[in-house]
């Protein structure tokens, strides 16, 4: 028996950093997917085949007798620890620890770009292996197992990434509680800088500033929380999509300015953001912790132009859209 499952990447639409201080955030699944085949093996072991885990920005240098790989392959290896924990958790849940399982991974999601590649591979693995072992789990139950995987590997996790990946669509998050928001099409372009910042260090930097200047930083965080609630109102409204696009774009631009004020933007991120806006995006902002990673732009009828502008500015564009589907069982073969 073989099972194929897939799970999507995610972006934080609004609320990164302020969510650490109890403010709400909105995240969404996007139509870039990780695919996991699962099947039994007769060795009683866990075997992981990573076909094409993507590490963008690969640079290879050649000298007379050596080849230097200048990419962080530690990030790709880190993904495999999520896969192993996911398989072990599902085998425990199914009480089938002795079963050998082989998983084969292919992915459209770049590693280390802040798009939830680790959560997607964990969720897809849980989905495929649970079906293989005859364990019937809802997507909500799979999201909880995905959160448990993150806790085991990372030591801390809000649960946003695996929940969005398992359930799909838009999720409003506040103080540990999730609310699924109505779906609407958002034509977006994600731009990757080619580098990633340390979430831990960036969160610590904002914390230092908050502790030293609470009267300055607190109003910024409050404003970011209000942006999230306004964005939620827009998503819940029955206004025409064109009107909602314009309103969401304005909120994105304001949110980016506040993130810049917190010090988490970089020259490259700002270049991609402003290139996207100049090319016709209604809004563009950082998604995730900042310090590198990705931005995203809302670009109805302008995705190609915005993608070209991001490329010219030195980024890697990914034309995509919000995915209403989370985890999918794609195929089951006897």
Swiss-Prot record:
The active site is at residue 161. It is an enzyme of class 2 (transferase). This is Mevalonate kinase. Catalyzes the phosphorylation of (R)-mevalonate (MVA) to (R)-mevalonate 5-phosphate (MVAP). Functions in the mevalonate (MVA) pathway leading to isopentenyl diphosphate (IPP), a key precursor for the biosynthesis of isoprenoid compounds such as archaeal membrane lipids. Signal peptide: none annotated. Pfam families: GHMP_kinases_C, GHMP_kinases_N. It is found in: Cytoplasm. Its EC number is 2.7.1.36. Keywords: ATP-binding, Cytoplasm, Isoprene biosynthesis, Kinase, Lipid biosynthesis, Lipid metabolism, Magnesium, Nucleotide-binding, Transferase. One of its GO terms (biological process) is isopentenyl diphosphate biosynthetic process, mevalonate pathway. Its cofactor is Mg(2+). Belongs to the GHMP kinase family. Mevalonate kinase subfamily. Gene3D superfamilies: 3.30.230.10, GHMP kinase, C-terminal domain (3.30.70.890). The keyword DNA-binding does not apply. GO terms for cellular component: cytosol. ATP binds at residues 110-120. InterPro entries: GHMP_kinase_C_dom, GHMP_kinase_C_sf, GHMP_kinase_N_dom, GHMP_knse_ATP-bd_CS, Mev_gal_kin, Mevalonate_kinase_arc, Ribosomal_Su5_D2-typ_SF, Ribsml_uS5_D2-typ_fold_subgr. Pathway: Isoprenoid biosynthesis; isopentenyl diphosphate biosynthesis via mevalonate pathway; isopentenyl diphosphate from (R)-mevalonate: step 1/3. The keyword Transit peptide does not apply. It comes from the Archaea. Homodimer. SUPFAM superfamilies: GHMP Kinase, C-terminal domain, Ribosomal protein S5 domain 2-like.
């Amino acid at each position: 028996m073989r099972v194929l499952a897939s799970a999507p990447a995610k972006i934080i639409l609004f609320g990164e950093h302020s969510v650490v201080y109890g403010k709400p955030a909105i995240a969404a699944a996007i139509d870039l997917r990780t695919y996991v085949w699962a099947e039994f093996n007769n060795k009683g072991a866990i075997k992981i085949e990573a076909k094409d885990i993507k590490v963008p920005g690969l640079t290879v240098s050649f000298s007379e007798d050596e080849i230097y790989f200048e990419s962080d392959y530690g990030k790709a290896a880190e993904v495999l620890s999520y896969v192993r924990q996911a398989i072990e958790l599902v085998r425990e849940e199914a009480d089938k620890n002795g079963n050998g399982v082989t998983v084969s991974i292919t992915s459209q999601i770049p590693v280390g770009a802040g798009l939830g590649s680790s959560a997607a591979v964990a969720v897809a693995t849980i989905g495929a292996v649970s079906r293989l072992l005859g364990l019937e789990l809802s997507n909500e139950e799979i999201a909880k197992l995905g959160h448990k995987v993150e806790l085991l590997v990372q030591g801390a996790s809000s649960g946003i990434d695996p929940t969005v990946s398992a359930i799909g669509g838009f999720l409003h998050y506040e103080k540990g509680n999730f609310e699924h928001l109505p779906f609407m099409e958002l034509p977006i372009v994600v731009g990757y800088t080619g580098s990633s910042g340390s979430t831990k260090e960036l969160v610590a930097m904002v914390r230092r500033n908050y502790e030293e200047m609470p009267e300055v930083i607190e109003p910024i965080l409050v404003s970011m929380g209000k942006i999230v609630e306004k964005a939620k109102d827009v998503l819940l409204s029955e206004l025409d999509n064109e009107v909602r696009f314009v309103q969401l774009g304005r909120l994105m631009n304001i949110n980016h300015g506040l993130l810049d004020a917190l010090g988490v933007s970089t020259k490259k991120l700002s270049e991609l953001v402003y290139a996207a806006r100049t090319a016709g995006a209604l809004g563009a902002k950082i998604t995730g912790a900042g310090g590198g990673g990705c931005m995203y732009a809302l670009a109805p009828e302008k995705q190609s132009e915005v993608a070209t502008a991001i490329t010219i500015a030195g980024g890697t564009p990914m034309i995509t859209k919000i995915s209403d589907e989370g985890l999918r069982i794609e195929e089951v073969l006897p």
